[in-house]
């Protein structure tokens, strides 16, 4: 191997290691058997959620996992492997990939890194069932609005009852 090739691969290992460290979620999948159309659809869904999916050679992923301090992640890098990286929402990649796997049997979740910790398949599947950040924020907003709304309805009902009594 030439020195240039080695330098390029070392640079790629650095980039992937940094991406692993900076992502709140990096989910590893086996995409063997997916059609081009399915992969395109999956990438589109991930992109809409702000998630980037990359196909990276296993040797590079193993070295990057080592460099990033995720040695326990190395066993999942066997066979055709893709990694979905999210820098904002730790739930989005797991949720999208798990939902996609329900319709595309060929896609298999393997594990990943979630919020700085190596996650096995079971943990990834648990995250896939959690509500997303946006869903949680909407729920909190509704909970905060409910008391105000209830008071407004009560005041309106009292006012209407007062109008009926006056008539």
Curated annotation (Swiss-Prot):
Disulfide bond residue pairs: none
Protein name (record): Large ribosomal subunit protein uL10
Family annotation (Gene3D superfamilies): 3.30.70.1730, 6.10.250.290
GO biological process terms on file: translation
Pfam families registered for this protein in UniProt: Ribosomal_L10 (PF00466)
Signal peptide: none
Keyword rRNA-binding assigned: yes
Family to which the UniProt record says this protein belongs: Belongs to the universal ribosomal protein uL10 family.
GO MF terms, alphabetically ordered: large ribosomal subunit rRNA binding; structural constituent of ribosome
Keywords associated with the record: Ribonucleoprotein, Ribosomal protein, RNA-binding, rRNA-binding
Record-level GO cellular component terms: large ribosomal subunit
InterPro entries referenced in this protein's UniProt entry, alphabetically: Ribosomal_uL10, Ribosomal_uL10-like_sf, Ribosomal_uL10_bac, Ribosomal_uL10_bac_type, Ribosomal_uL10_CS_bac
General function of this protein: Forms part of the ribosomal stalk, playing a central role in the interaction of the ribosome with GTP-bound translation factors.
Quaternary state and interactors: Part of the ribosomal stalk of the 50S ribosomal subunit. The N-terminus interacts with L11 and the large rRNA to form the base of the stalk. The C-terminus forms an elongated spine to which L12 dimers bind in a sequential fashion forming a multimeric L10(L12)X complex.
């Amino acid at each position: 191997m030439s020195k240039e090739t080695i330098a390029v691969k070392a640079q790629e290992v650095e980039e992937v290691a940094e991406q692993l460290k900076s992502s709140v979620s990096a989910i590893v999948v086996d995409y063997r058997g997916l059609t081009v159309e399915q992969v395109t659809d999956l990438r589109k869904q991930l992109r809409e959620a702000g998630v980037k999916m990359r196909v990276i050679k296993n040797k590079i992923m193993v070295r990057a996992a080592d460099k990033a301090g995720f040695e326990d992640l190395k066993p999942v890098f066997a066979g055709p492997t893709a990694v979905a990286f999210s820098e904002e929402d730790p739930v989005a990649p797991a949720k999208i990939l798990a939902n996609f796997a329900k319709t595309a049997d060929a896609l298999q979740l393997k594990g990943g890194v979630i919020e700085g910790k190596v996650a096995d398949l079971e943990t990834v599947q648990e995250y896939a069932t959690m509500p997303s950040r946006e869903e949680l924020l909407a729920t909190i907003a509704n909970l905060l609005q409910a008391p105000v709304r209830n008071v407004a309805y009560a005041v309106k009902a009292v006012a209407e009852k007062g109008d009926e009594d006056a008539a």
